[in-house]
Amino acid sequence: MFKFHQMKHIFEILDKMRCLRKRSTVSFLGVLVIFLLFMNLYIEDSYVLEGDKQLIRETSTHQLNSERYVHTFKDLSNFSGAINVTYRYLAATPLQRKRYLTIGLSSVKRKKGNYLLETIKSIFEQSSYEELKEISVVVHLADFNSSWRDAMVQDITQKFAHHIIAGRLMVIHAPEEYYPILDGLKRNYNDPEDRVKFRSKQNVDYAFLLNFCANTSDYYVMLEDDVRCSKNFLTAIKKVIASLEGTYWVTLEFSKLGYIGKLYHSHDLPRLAHFLLMFYQEMPCDWLLTHFRGLLAQKNVIRFKPSLFQHMGYYSSYKGTENKLKDDDFEEESFDIPDNPPASLYTNMNVFENYEASKAYSSVDEYFWGKPPSTGDVFVIVFENPIIIKKIKVNTGTEDRQNDILHHGALDVGENVMPSKQRRQCSTYLRLGEFKNGNFEMSGVNQKIPFDIHCMRIYVTKTQKEWLIIRSISIWTS
């Protein structure tokens, strides 16, 4: 952590550097932005991951030898402040109140295909009337071709006029004059020059979009312009956010593809916008998002399944090349995140490394993994308070390890929690049923069980030679 007198000394040095001749201006700016990045991203958090430190060190060593950087970096004196851009409102009515979630899209002219209208349609059609009150959609038409922009605005206003009037849909454009130079950039990763230009501009497109959306809502989710949404995705997102109350997070992921479905606190958007703008020519946007998450001290990916958003475009926005990427975790209908009420979990199975019991109960993409279980081994969930359960679903094994399932087991529910020297546990259990092909699912549990449930346990009925993965335990309460 920087001390005040150290900061003062640094600023005195920087102030003296301003007196250097003009040819030193760019180098000074290079030093300044690296200093500011550390100040803003490091001073508030306890550590920076080594990989991200290396990124900063490598970037800081690049020779800043062009006047174009002056324009790019001149507004970076405050990473929490807005980037100075005057936007053009192509279709919008004033936002009367702050919403819960802003959905941001950036779109450019494609050589083949156009999926933007279908994406906007999916957002609105997959949302209920109540959900529509809590969202705003911001579309950044980022292409410099004014004829294309005019045509797209006409199509959008014709199809979604009522959403524009209601303040749910805004179409904006950041003028070309605010963009840094996009030609003659470094060819990192030996990318061809046109690809470097494409991905570098895309980073700036998103930086300006994030900058605009910083004060429109409490949360922000990033989409591409060729995506379809799961039914009631907002309700699912709200449920996840509520379940993480009190937990530190920077990025939540609701898709495993690129930067589709990345969710942020809106108060982080200014820093993320500055970050993308600073390193716009270094690497693709999704890589930068990963580094940003690490710099703000979220070490691990927090991704939820099933995915809420699916890539539907067939042709890429880069050169119109074929792009058949699909998220096989996507479920379009009735996405229902379980309640999974607070509970303690334990097992007497031999746990492998850090794949502990609690990971099977999390809605994050992780699981419990144990060495071969024996007859009588148990995996127990003790709820903080007795609950009424509507539905239970337990899945074992994974795609990669399809034989690491529970081959012989049953699921029991219990009552009458008794204290013990080691942990709380129930004194009596009632068997609900057996596992079939490694899975257990039962609806209407509350109609079959005459008591409030204090415990739930997975009971191994026969020794197996295979290891056991419990991929997910899902509980819905009434």
From Swiss-Prot:
Residues carrying covalently attached carbohydrate according to the record: 84, 215
Catalysed transformations (reactions): N(4)-{beta-D-GlcNAc-(1->2)-alpha-D-Man-(1->3)-[beta-D-GlcNAc-(1->2)-alpha-D-Man-(1->6)]-beta-D-Man-(1->4)-beta-D-GlcNAc-(1->4)-beta-D-GlcNAc}-L-asparaginyl-[protein] + UDP-N-acetyl-alpha-D-glucosamine = N(4)-{beta-D-GlcNAc-(1->2)-[beta-D-GlcNAc-(1->4)]-alpha-D-Man-(1->3)-[beta-D-GlcNAc-(1->2)-alpha-D-Man-(1->6)]-beta-D-Man-(1->4)-beta-D-GlcNAc-(1->4)-beta-D-GlcNAc}-L-asparaginyl-[protein] + UDP + H(+)
Tissues where the protein occurs: Expressed in heart, adrenal gland, testis, liver, brain and fetal brain. Not expressed in pancreas.
Class of the enzyme per the UniProt entry, highest EC level: transferase
InterPro entries: Glyco_transf_54, MGAT4_A/B/C_C
One of the record's GO cellular component terms: Golgi membrane
Segments on the Cytoplasmic side according to the record's topology features: 1-23
Membrane topology: Single-pass type II membrane protein
Transmembrane annotation, as ranges: 24-44
Molecular-function annotations in GO: acetylglucosaminyltransferase activity; alpha-1,3-mannosylglycoprotein 4-beta-N-acetylglucosaminyltransferase activity; metal ion binding
Subcellular location: Golgi apparatus membrane
A Pfam family recorded for this sequence: MGAT4A_C
GO biological process: protein N-linked glycosylation; viral protein processing
Protein's pathway: Protein modification; protein glycosylation
Cited function: Glycosyltransferase that participates in the transfer of N-acetylglucosamine (GlcNAc) to the core mannose residues of N-linked glycans. Catalyzes the formation of the GlcNAcbeta1-4 branch on the GlcNAcbeta1-2Manalpha1-3 arm of the core structure of N-linked glycans. Essential for the production of tri- and tetra-antennary N-linked sugar chains. Does not catalyze the transfer of GlcNAc to the Manalpha1-6 arm to form GlcNAcBeta1-4Manalpha1-6 linkage ('GnT-VI' activity).
Cited PANTHER family: ALPHA-1,3-MANNOSYL-GLYCOPROTEIN 4-BETA-N-ACETYLGLUCOSAMINYLTRANSFERASE C (PTHR12062:SF14), N-ACETYLGLUCOSAMINYLTRANSFERASE VI (PTHR12062)
The protein, known as: Alpha-1,3-mannosyl-glycoprotein 4-beta-N-acetylglucosaminyltransferase C
